[in-house]
């Protein structure tokens, strides 16, 4: 059985990959997303790499910049 830390690491990595895919679909560099979202390019790099436990406020800024919407947590 996997521990909590490895599960969270995998979720951060998957979220980062999703953000990267949306950004590149827009044809944007990381710096462009950072500027539009009002965060640093270093944060974008860390988030996309799955190395940053991003908070909901930053996620909301990124989603807004990408024209996406954050969804509520739903039970499967």
Where are the regions that the model predicts?
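DNA major-groove recognition helix of helix-turn-helix/homeodomain DNA-binding modules
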Residues: 57-72
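N-terminal flexible/basic segments that precede or flank functional cores
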Residues: 1-17, 69
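Recognition helix of helix-turn-helix/homeodomain-like DNA-binding domains
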Residues: 38-53
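Short basic helix-loop element that most often maps to the first helix and adjoining turn
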Residues: 17-36, 61
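Short, conserved catalytic or interaction motifs in soluble domains
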Residues: 49, 74-75
């Amino acid at each position: 059985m996997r521990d909590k830390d490895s599960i969270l690491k995998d979720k951060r990595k998957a979220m980062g990959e999703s953000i990267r895919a949306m950004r590149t679909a827009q044809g944007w560099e990381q710096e462009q997303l950072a500027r539009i979202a009002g965060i640093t390019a270093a944060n974008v790099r860390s988030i996309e790499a799955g190395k940053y436990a991003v908070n909901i406020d930053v996620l909301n800024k990124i989603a807004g910049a990408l024209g996406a919407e954050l969804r509520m947590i739903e039970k499967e």
